[in-house]
Amino acid sequence: MGKLHSKHACKRRENPEGDSFVVNGFIAKRAAEEDERYGNNLKDYKNEELKDGRLTLLHCPLQVVLPPEKAEGCESFLQYLSPDDGERDAQKVKKRISLQDLECNVSLAEDNRQEWVFTLYDFDNSGKVTKEDMSSLMHTIYDVVDASVKHSCNTKRRSLRVKLSVTPEPAARRRDATHTERETSHLSQVEPVRSEEHRSADRRQSTHIRGQTEAHEGNHYCVDENTERRNHYLDLAGIENYTSRFDSSSPDADQDPPSRSSHSQSRPHSQEPETHVYQRRSQLIEPCVAPDPRLRTGPQLIRSRSPKGSSRFPGVIPNVTKTSKCHGHHQPIPTGQDVYHLTQQNHTHAHTPSGLQHSHSRRIRSRAREQQALTPVKNTNATALVQRHEHHHHHEHHHHHHYHHYHQT
């Protein structure tokens, strides 16, 4: 090979500065000659205008001619067009072909469209579809379509476009749709029911806890304090309450716990009629003897409702008031069968005081004083028994209404 066709020689130098690239001197000389020849031609015409034919070697066309684009489906229609037809054929072409909707290698004529429908029986009977099943299915569909497809214009290119959509049968589709609608409606109905159940359970639990706390905190108050308070103030004003007089007593008095029995039993028995209370009071007063005139003065007539009220009056006998806050609680000496019957009856009444006597206590005490003034009494022990009975009612009355008794004198 000559020097012109020889490659660049890379020689390694022995100095520590590194390698050097040695270029063939003949190639550099040829490039310098070409530069001088073309440079002289440009220098000659630097200050003059270029004329036609001077630079023929450098003249080249800058326009690129491209072949016309043709659609595959419309070749048979376009090749038979002649320029003699004129505007009539141009309008037909515009009607048949829309350049905006045109796609490469796709025919838009409706006659060339073909449709295949594949019905698959028990395709997902097992409920699982793998990639192998899908690939074998696609290969089968492609083979069937390729064998039965009809290409227009008998062209060499074969481009096949397949659209696969898997849909159930119409009957199965309706059945699935109704089933899903029923399930969704059922679920939408079940959720509010569950939420209502949770809300009602929360309400029951909260009311149960609230009832327990109220029972532990305020077990010494009456069940219906507002009604008792209203009746008491109506009695103080001189207005009789006829609604609480004729109400029936509730049967749940015996089912209360023992810790609340002494205080909550006044509510069920507070709705007894006034006639029974008046008969009990008359039964206790008739067989009694006249008390000592010293006992009828002071606290027996005024009846202070505060627990310290009876000790404020100086006319009370010491043996009556030394064993209690108010009047004496000493045991009476039974003198006969009637007195024993009175003590037993008095014990039963002491454990079941009536709230109606609290609400109408002033009118009842006035009637009792009239009966004591008219009836001659001979036994002093019965007097203490009557005083004990009277005091027990006032003592219970203090427990129920102690929040407004301090305003009275």
UniProtKB/Swiss-Prot annotation:
GO terms for molecular function: calcium ion binding. This is Protein naked cuticle homolog 2-like. Keywords: Calcium, Cell membrane, Cytoplasm, Lipoprotein, Membrane, Metal-binding, Myristate, Wnt signaling pathway. Coiled coil: none annotated. One of its GO terms (biological process) is Wnt signaling pathway. Its main location: membrane. One of its GO terms (cellular component) is cytoplasm. SUPFAM superfamilies: EF-hand. Residues 389-409 have a biased composition (Basic residues). Belongs to the NKD family. Cell autonomous antagonist of both the canonical and non-canonical Wnt signaling pathways. Residues 109-144 form the EF-hand domain. The gene is nkd2l. Residues 171-185, 193-224 have a biased composition (Basic and acidic residues). InterPro entries: EF-hand-dom_pair, EF_Hand_1_Ca_BS, EF_hand_dom, Nkd-like. Residues 247-268 have a biased composition (Low complexity). Residues 166-224, 243-315, 346-367, 388-409 are annotated as: Disordered. A lipid is attached at G2 (N-myristoyl glycine). It is found in: Cell membrane; Cytoplasm. Ca(2+) binds at D122, D124, S126, K128, D133.
